[in-house]
Amino acid sequence: MKRVVLTRQTKDSNALASLLREQGVETLQFPLMAIEPLPVDSPERLPAEHGLTVLVFTSSNAVQYGLHAIRDLASNDSCTVIAVGKRTLEALQSESIDAIAPEREDSEGILELPIFQDAMIDRVIVVKGEGGRDLLQRALIGRGVTVIDLNCYRRYWPAVDVDKLDQFLEDGAPLIHVASGEAVVRLTDLVSTAVQRQSSLVVPSGRVAHQARALGWHRVEEAEGAGDAAFIEVFSRCE
C-alpha cells in the first residue's frame, strides 16, 4: 500500500490528507514550516496608483494576511489580480476578488501569462511571505517594471517530533510531498541518507527538483505546482 507524508501546514494539507485516507492511503501530516503574520503597509503608504497595476498573491496565506491592506486596489477594475495556485485563487474568490491564475503554479507560470507579454505594466505589487519569489522579481525588474514587495507573513521552523517521522518512515518508504525549496532543506536536515535513497520526493517545480537532487535525494518526482491536484496526478502516476 502506498504511503504519504504531507509537509505543508496542517490547515493547508487537511483536504488532501482526507482524500488520501478515504482511498486507504496511510498518511502522515508532518508540517515542516509554520506561519506568523507581519505588520503590513497601509494603502496610503504604498506608492500612489499610476498606470497599469498588477497584484500577485503568491499563496492563500498572502490573501489571509495581506488582502486587508490593499482590498480597495484589488477591487478596482483597473487592477489585474493574479493568484499563484488554485487554493490562492479560491481564497481570493471567497473574498469577492476577481483573479486569474496560471496553469503552472510558480513564478515561471506567472511570467508566461499574456498580460506580461502584451501589456504595458508600470508596477507589480507582490503580496507574499518574507523572502521568496526572487525569480519573479528579477525577471520583472529586468523588463523595466517597478516591483513592490508586500511582505505580510513570515515562515519559521516549528519544533517537530522527529521520532514520529522516523517511526512512520521505518514502516516503508513513502511519497513525501514538499511545497518549496525551503521545505526540502528542512526535511533533508531531519532524515537519514537511507531515507533520501529510498523515499520518493514530490516537488512543485524543476528548480526545486534540481535543488533536491543536489541535496542527495535520489527519487524526485516533479509535479505541475504545489497544489493538491498536482500532487494527486503524480500520486496516480506512481501507483
Question: What are the residue ranges of the model-derived segments?
Answer:
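Signature of uroporphyrinogen-III synthase
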Residues: 1-239
